[in-house]
Each structure stands twice: as structure tokens, then as C-alpha cells.
Amino acid sequence: EQGLLDGATPFFAPVPKVNDAQNPFLTNAGAAVWGDAATFIPYTLYRHFRDKGLLKQYLNLMTDWVDWIYRQDEARGGNRLWDFGWQLGDWLALDSGIKGSVFGATDSALIASAYYYISADYTAKMLSVLEDNRSEFYRTLAKEVREKIIHTYFNGDELNTNPVTLQSEVENIRQSMAQNYGGVTIPTAIDTQTGLAVLLRHGLYPNEVARDKLAKRLQEKMDEHNGYLT
């Protein structure tokens, strides 16, 4: 399935046969987080079982997926942000304030770019385990994506809550989908519970001062909702 899609991960495997489908799950492929199963599953299996044979079996799944994202990125100038295409974002999150909405409030470009970094990083690590010299390419790619995320989403050690990604292709598609399906505009934000947690969990901040500020803001967000996730 992945080979037929030039390396993109399908939403379903096997891909269902459809005729004149309008459902984007049936007509699209290659979205962050969902598609990143291609790197997360082999990485997690290796961490638990340390089986290099199994890792080698699924290594192309990892490299093909990251290569597909990289090619899309390069075709748009090599900006090292995944701020283009159709994204699920923080799917089914409850913080948009719109009843019945499947769209969360978190900037989908932030989520997609973070997972671009994570998948490149995981792929580099697994290639290193197998002593494959391709690891350097993915390590460098992960470093470049991480640096771009920090440059885009931080001003010094302060979180930038009005980044350029709020005017990105991803955001325009997201708002168009919200209008088409519900006639609403989504209040997109960076400092959501999800946005803050992703940045903290994966070390996507410039320094420890920034880290502490993110952690404090996440605690405030939790307190605002009486300890509940949104």
C-alpha cells in the first residue's frame, strides 16, 4: 500500500476501493500522527524486544514515510515545517469550544512539524542501531526541523502565540473544512494543553527557562479546566 502511494502512509490498509468518494479519509493519504505509525511502531517494538531482525524487516516502512514528507517539504522550498497539505491535527480534542466539532484548537502545523521531527529522529536512531550510514541524513534532517520549530514558535524563551503558521496552507485547509462541515471558524491556538505537552515531551524548546515557562503554562491550562484534559 505504501509503495503505491510513493511512501505515504494510507489511512486504511488495505486501502478500500471507492467510487466518487467525498470522505477525505478515503481520498487522501499521508497525514501527521496517523501516518507516523510507520515510524512509531517499529521504534516501539525495538525498544521493547531489541529484535534487530524485526527492525530490519520494517526499516523501509520508516525511511519511506520520512522520505515522503521530506520530498513534499523540498518541493515547497525545504522550509522544514510541515505546514502544508491536509492534516487531522488534534483530532477529536474538546478545546475548540464548538459543540460536536472533530477539530481541536491546536495549530495543526505545530503538531505536524513536531511529528516530522520525531519521525526523522526515530528513523535516525533505528538506522544507527543497524549501523546503517543513512542515519546521518535523518539525524541532520531532524536537527533542521527542530531548529525551525524553535525559530518559528519561540521569541527568545517566550512562546510565540502568533506564528506565521496561523496563515499557512494547513490552516487554510483546516478552516475550509470546518466551514464546509459545520459552518464554523476554529479558534486556532499554540498554547493549548496539547501544544504545550508536545513541545515539552519532545524537547522542542530553546532552553531550560523556556521549558519552565511551558510547564507553568501547562499547569495553568490544567487548572483552568479543574485538572481535566481538553
Label the predicted regions.
Residues 1-230:
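Active-site core of glycosidic bond-cleaving carbohydrate-active enzymes
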